[in-house]
Structures are given as structure tokens and as C-alpha cells.
């Protein structure tokens, strides 16, 4: 069992336990890269064995929907089982799908999560392409970024979305909205808030995804200037 599967099963079980739900009606997962370690293991096997005498195990466990499938097998859940692979917005896509399923009254509760793992070969390639930072560039600061690349990390997070308020409810998910490209961040944010009957002055706290990538500094600066509310940051602790 790969690391991504292990993380996914543990995180999903904890989420279900907190929600006091044994079997969800659906499982929706978002992943940007899938089970990288098993993917590399399978591809390495192809090269080492000259494309002969390969066992299918590593290939089966390398597919992007492996985590959602293994969670369903572990729970004996026969409901809807979706996996979204949409780059940096994979988790957001999963959340949006779950929200629409509940809003349209198709389902009453859904286990939804996001997961990604690190692997040695991909990690080294990303460093060469300056997508992530090298260890010799440490310490990394998200407030004073001077180099390209983000802080690479891995992990799993799961939530249970429900159509009703209970004593175990943490918060209400009001809206999810994202686009592929926007010419004006200010207009995009104000449109999102206005369609929910809000303005920037109504926001008490902004949770910023500011990272340590020099290429992203201007974008985060522009967004944070729009809000006068307090701001908190987390990627210096969790990575990207």
C-alpha cells in the first residue's frame, strides 16, 4: 500500500469519526499528481525489465483514483466514487462537485478530500525546473521571496459535507468559485463577494495561500491589498 493510500485512509477515517458517519453516500477526491511513488515504481520496472515480465500491481496502484477506490473498499462504500485531477485546483474541483451534489439534493452527505505525495524522481525533476526550491536555498520565507519555486510538501485532508446542521458541524460552506484566467483580480473578488451579498469590508479574516515563490508575489500582493481585514498565513508551516 502506497503512502498516498495510507494517508488517505487515515485522514478519511478521522473525518468520518468526527462527523459520526460510518459510511458516506459518496467519496470525492482531488489529486494533482496521484500516486507518484507507485507510478515511478512501475515505470522503473518497465525500463529495468525491458518491457517484459511485468506484474500489474504497481500499475493498478499508480492510477489517480487509487486512493478513492481504496477508501471505498475499506469502508465497503458502494456509492458514487469520483476523482478529480485538475492540477492546482483538483481539491477545489472536488469540493465544488460535492457542493453541487448536495445543493441539487442528490445526496445528503459526502466524504471529500485532497491528497498528494512526494517521490524522489519527480522531486529532483521539479528542482531542476525550479518548480520547487532546493534544500540549499533554506531557510524559506513566504514574506520575502527571492527565488523561484515553492516549498514542496505532501499530505491528505478530508471533510464530510452534509445538507444539515448538527452538533458536529464545524462550519458552513457558502460558495466555491474559480476560473482558469482572470485579467483583473479586484473585479474577480468583488464579483464573487457581491453574488453572495458581501463586500470586502464585510470580511473579518483573510486566509492567504501566499507561498515562497518569487513569481507569485505580485499576485498575492494585489489580492491582500484589496482587504483591510486581518490576514493569516500557513504555507510556511505546511508547504505547497
Stretches with model-predicted labels:
Residues 1-70, 74-81, 116-118, 195-227:
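Conserved beta-ketoacyl condensing-enzyme motif
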Residues 3-10, 22, 62, 66, ...:
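Conserved active-site and cofactor/substrate-binding residues in soluble primary-metabolism enzymes
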Residues 9-18, 72-74, 82-113, 154-166:
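Active-site-proximal alpha-helical scaffold in enzymes
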Residues 20-21, 52, 75-77, 102-104, ...:
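Solvent-exposed alpha-helices and their adjacent loops that cap or buttress functional pockets
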Residues 35-38, 90-94, 118-123, 182-183:
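Short, well-ordered, mixed-charge alpha-helical segments that flank or form enzyme active sites
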Residues 54-59, 81-89, 144-148, 179:
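Flexible, glycine/proline-enriched loop segments at strand-loop-helix junctions
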Residues 106-128, 147, 175-185, 208-217, ...:
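Acyl-CoA/ACP chain-elongation machinery
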Residues 126-205, 229-233:
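Condensing-enzyme catalytic core mediating Claisen C-C bond formation in acyl metabolism
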Amino acid at each position: 500500500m502506497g503512502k498516498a493510500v495510507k494517508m488517505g485512509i487515515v485522514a478519511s477515517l478521522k473525518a468520518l469519526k468526527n462527523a459520526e458517519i460510518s459510511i458516506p453516500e459518496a467519496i470525492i477526491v482531488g489529486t494533482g499528481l496521484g500516486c507518484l511513488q507507485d507510478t515511478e515504481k512501475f515505470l522503473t520496472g518497465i525500463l529495468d525489465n525491458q518491457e517484459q515480465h511485468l506484474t500489474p500491481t504497481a500499475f493498478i496502484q499508480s492510477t489517480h483514483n487509487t486512493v478513492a477506490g481504496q477508501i471505498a473498499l475499506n469502508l465497503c462504500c458502494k456509492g458514487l466514487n469520483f476523482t478529480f485531477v485538475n492540477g492546482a485546483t483538483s481539491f477545489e474541483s472536488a469540493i465544488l462537485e460535492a457542493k453541487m451534489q448536495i445543493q441539487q439534493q442528490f445526496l445528503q452527505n459526502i466524504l471529500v478530500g485532497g491528497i498528494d505525495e512526494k517521490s524522489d524522481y519527480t522531486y529532483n525533476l521539479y528542482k531542476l525546473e525550479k518548480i520547487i526550491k532546493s534544500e540549499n536555498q533554506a531557510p524559506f520565507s513566504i514574506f520575502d521571496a527571492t527565488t523561484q519555486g515553492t516549498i514542496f510538501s505532501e499530505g491528505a485532508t478530508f471533510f464530510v459535507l452534509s445538507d444539515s446542521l448538527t452538533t458536529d458541524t464545524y462550519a458552513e460552506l457558502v460558495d466555491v468559485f474559480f476560473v482558469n484566467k482572470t485579467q483583473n483580480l479586484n473585479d474577480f473578488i468583488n464579483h464573487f463577494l457581491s453574488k453572495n451579498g458581501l463586500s470586502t469590508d464585510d470580511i473579518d479574516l483573510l486566509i492567504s495561500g501566499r507561498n515562497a515563490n518569487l513569481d507569485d508575489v505580485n499576485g498575492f500582493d494585489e489580492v491582500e491589498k484589496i482587504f483591510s481585514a486581518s490576514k493569516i498565513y500557513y504555507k510556511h508551516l505546511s508547504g505547497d
